[in-house]
């Protein structure tokens, strides 16, 4: 538990991060910042509750940020608050596997979950849900956004999307859902 900390990983290879009862707030930057453009396994350890939040007014893209493609799994719970921009931001695709527990976006200034770099020419910005219960509340823009001509694949799981922004969407996609 830390109210003034972060996990920063720089790498060039696939990696796995296990969250097992983590409470992490960074008042200036992302709580988790993974600077690796490969596959990032994110295990939510069964029976644990993990809470992430970033600070207000920074320039970062999310409380949980990765350059690569996170694949969430495990029966735990992840609660994320995005006080600067997005709650969860992946510059490539993002996947919730069949074994994923619960992911709760408590609040986000912009998108609850954002996939993409914002370059409008990258078609690797997909949102994939195969399982889990994903809940997005209090998003300042869209609940889930697959940018850059990305697609959305909804193969299972549960999406609870509570649109609160006047011009926001539950699911926003530049290509096909």
Residue ranges of each PLM-predicted region?
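A composition-driven surface/loop motif
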Residues: 1-177
């Amino acid at each position: 538990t830390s109210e003034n900390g972060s996990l920063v990983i720089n790498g060039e290879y696939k990696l796995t991060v296990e969250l097992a009862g983590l409470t992490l707030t960074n008042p200036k930057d992302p709580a988790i910042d993974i600077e690796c453009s490969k596959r990032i396994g994110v295990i939510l350890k069964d029976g644990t509750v993990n809470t992430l939040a970033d600070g207000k007014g920074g320039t970062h893209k999310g409380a949980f940020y990765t350059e690569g493609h996170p694949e969430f799994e495990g029966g735990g719970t992840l609660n994320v608050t995005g006080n600067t921009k997005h709650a969860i931001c992946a510059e490539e695709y993002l996947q919730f596997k069949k074994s994923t527990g619960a992911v709760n976006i408590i609040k986000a200034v912009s998108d609850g979950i954002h996939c993409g770099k914002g370059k409008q020419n990258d078609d690797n910005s997909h949102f994939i849900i195969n399982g889990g219960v994903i809940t997005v509340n209090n998003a300042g823009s869209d609940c889930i956004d697959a940018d850059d001509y990305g697609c959305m694949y909804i193969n299972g799981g549960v999406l609870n999307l509570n649109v609160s922004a006047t011009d926001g969407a539950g699911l926003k996609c530049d290509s096909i859902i």
